[in-house]
């Protein structure tokens, strides 16, 4: 059985915390489509921090992720997630792979003897993981674009 985190399948949304506001991850979809036939559809989704279970199930169905089971956990701490994964490992007998985007959870699950895969997309860094970049206010961006457009226009006019 493959246990894959919901964060692998969907990108976080800046608009809302609801699962329905998320967009599917192209890399997550490729990973899903690779493992699904190899493990005869024995794929489980691990949704941590999700409060709207029905909305999550509808999102998975709408996006074409046919999981054999979906496990929900309201608490989104590292310890709670690792404990639930250990419980699922005991219930299902053997988890072939656990796939997640959180390196702390992957390290602890791997330490407990479950094969893991840390999924990252190096060319896109999540804002919460980046320490060097800060979000700019929209007004600041608009001012900067306007200033660049004015400078470009002035450069083209020359002395008239």
Predicted regions span which residues?
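C-terminal cap/substrate-recognition subdomain and adjoining C-terminal extension
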Residues: 53-160
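Alpha-helical substrate-recognition element adjacent to the catalytic core
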Residues: 1-80, 159-160
């Amino acid at each position: 059985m493959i246990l894959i985190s919901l964060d692998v399948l969907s990108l976080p949304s800046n608009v809302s915390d609801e699962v329905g506001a998320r967009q599917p991850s192209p890399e997550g979809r490729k990973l899903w489509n690779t493992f699904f036939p190899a493990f005869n559809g024995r794929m489980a989704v691990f949704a941590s921090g999700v409060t709207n279970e029905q909305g999550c199930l509808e999102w998975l169905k709408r996006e074409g992720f046919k999981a054999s089971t979906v496990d929900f956990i309201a608490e989104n701490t590292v310890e709670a997630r690792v404990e639930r994964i250990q419980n699922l490992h005991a219930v299902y007998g053997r988890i072939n792979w656990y796939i997640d985007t959180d390196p702390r959870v992957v390290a602890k699950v791997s330490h407990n003897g479950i094969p893991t895969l840390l999924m990252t997309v190096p060319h896109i860094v999540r804002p919460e993981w980046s320490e060097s970049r800060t979000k700019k206010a929209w007004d600041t961006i608009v001012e900067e674009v306007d200033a660049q457009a004015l400078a470009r226009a002035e450069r083209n006019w020359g002395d008239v």
